[in-house]
Each structure stands twice: as C-alpha cells, then as structure tokens.
Swiss-Prot record:
Protein name, entry field: Beta-casein
Keywords: Milk protein, Phosphoprotein, Secreted, Signal
Family: Belongs to the beta-casein family.
Function field: Important role in determination of the surface properties of the casein micelles.
Residues the record lists as Phosphoserine modifications: S23, S25
Organism: Trichosurus vulpecula (Brush-tailed possum)
Localization per Swiss-Prot or TrEMBL: Secreted
Lineage: Eukaryota, Metazoa, Chordata, Craniata, Vertebrata
Gene Ontology cellular component list: extracellular region
Tissue expression summary: Mammary gland specific. Secreted in milk.
Signal sequence coordinates: 1-15
Amino acid sequence: MKLLILTCLVVLAVARPMVEKISESEEHVTDVPENEHRLEINRYLRPEYEMMNLYYQPFYWSEEMRNLKMTSLPKDRRMAVLKSVVSDDMLPPLQHKSLSLPKPKVLPLSHRQILPPHTLRMVPLSHKLFTIPKREMLPISERERLPAHERENLLAHEREILLAPQREMSLIPEREILLAAERVVLPEQEREIRPDNEREVLAVHKREILPASEKEKVLPLFQERVLPLHRREIVPPYQRDTIARREILPVDQRELMPEVVAVDLYPFFQPVANFYYPAELNEKN
C-alpha cells in the first residue's frame, strides 16, 4: 500500500511540469492568433460607432455639424442655403415693380354694324381692326363676289388670297370630283370606243342633260359589245332599269362563286344501343 502511494506521488511530481508547459503553450497559441485576426479585421472594417455614423449622419457634414442636433442649428447655417448667388444689384428693377399693361379698348358695335354670327367668328381682335383692310375681314366666299374691275385694284397678297381656292380646284381633274359610280371612261379604255360614240366619253351628268331624242342615238356600251366586268359601273342610271341587277353591280368575289342551292334538312336518327339490356330487347323495342 505504501509502495502504491509512493509511485503515485512520483508520477505526479514528474507530470506536473509537463502539464504546466502544455498549458502555457496553449495560452500562447490561443492569444496570438486572436490578436492577429482582430488586426486583419480592423484593416477592412471600421469601428462600430463609425459604421453607425455612416447611416445616421451624412458624410459631407463637418465636425461641428455632427455634434449639433437638427433642432438647434445656428441661424446662419440654416439660412445659408436660401441666400441667392446673384447680388441684388444684378437683378433687374422689374421684380420690385408691378407690371402695368394698358387694357385693350373694346369698341362696342352700333346697331347698323351688327354682323351675322358666321361673320363675327372671322372678325379679328378689336385692336387689329384699324390695321387690316376691310376686304380681308370678309370671308373668302364673299370676297370672290367682287367684280373684275375691283379685283384688279387689289394688292398682290390680297389677290393671292382671293385666287388661292380657285388655283387649288384647278389642280383636281374633273373625273376625280365625280362619284365612284359616275366617273368618266379612263384614258386606256377610250381607245376601245369608236369615234362615232364620242358622247359616251362625256361624264354621266353631262350625258343625262341631253334631250331624249339624242339620248336614243347614243348607243349604250352594253349594247355595242359585251361589257367587261370592270366597266359595268359606267352604265348611266336611266339605262339601268333595262339591265339585270346582277350586271349593274360591281365585280365582287361573290359573283364568281356558284349559287347555293337550298337543301331541306331532314332528321337522321341513329339506332340506340342500351348498355343494360341485351341486343334482343333493343331489336324488339
């Protein structure tokens, strides 16, 4: 028993310095890397209070402004933004004076000068009445009624305004003014018409003005030859009563299709096969 106790004491005495040495080495290992790790983190991250300042305080504020609250800003700091860059001497004096513009004088019309409503719309403002000649105040339809000797006395720009609608109408050919069903024969179709049928080249409304005796002399196009489909619309209205309705109508895709024959529909019953009964019962039924 004594021998066992002695061996234990010897083992403890030998093991004590080894345990202390191991513990010291562990402390050294744990302390040094932690300090080095913190130094590496501090290189890239700012302290906590500086990180909070980035969110709650603008980075362009000065150090004095950071220490002050928003409610206790000095007056000169608050009003510095509102000061104008331009000095008062550079500003024009009109800003300090109210603009007094003369009111336009409205001259009331007398009882004789009262104009119809369509003319009043074209009359310019009252302050321009004295600078515009009287003929320009009239609408174009009334200006065209001037006689020839008065038109010569007009100025150049007045004559241009007067002749503008007539010049525009002259550019439009007569066949374009007519309706689609009353157009004149096209130039490429005039070659097919004989010279004795010159009156057929006239517009439809001019052909209808002819007396009845002369109308009979003019052979309609559909009697001279079989009309092509694209020339059916040229037939005048007084001759359409003698022509079938199908020949007067313009060409359409429906004309080329055959007529649909009406078929009487009759019911078509199919034999009923019941699932729950055999075929013999269905035949009896």
